[in-house]
Amino acid sequence: MKIYKIPSDLRAFIFDIDSTLYTNQAYAFEQVDCQVRQFAKERGISADEARRMVAEYRKQFAAEHNGSKVSLGNTLLSFGVPIEQSVQWRRELLEPADFLRRDEKLIDELKILQKKYQLICVTNNPVLPARKTLDALGIS
């Protein structure tokens, strides 16, 4: 994490939820892979073939854009999957409680911060899986 400047009158902390507020490699992988598997299912191809397609597209994109990374949403869009569809897949397929557990240390630390600061969570996931994530961690 980089901290550029902390104002003297700090009133709030804004946390990204996934892989910042908590880390879980298996769930981070699942957030991507569940969409890739759904793409494979709808295309009638294997999950491994879909993973290969995604990896190849991302590699080609990086080569053509000075090493820049492309999101999974935009990768799927290049294969004809509207962003709205990939968002819907995340709503339907993500189950954070399968990977995350109540985190007492996180709860205690956030309680300390909450005494003095407003706490805000953000994510690029849809609201439903975000709320399920906070519930699983015990901080909703």
Briefly describe each language-model feature range.
Residues I3-E104, P126-R131:
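N-terminal helical cap/lid subdomain that shapes the substrate entry/recognition surface
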Residues I107-I120, N124-S140:
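Substrate-recognition/cap helix-loop segment adjacent to the acidic, metal-dependent catalytic center
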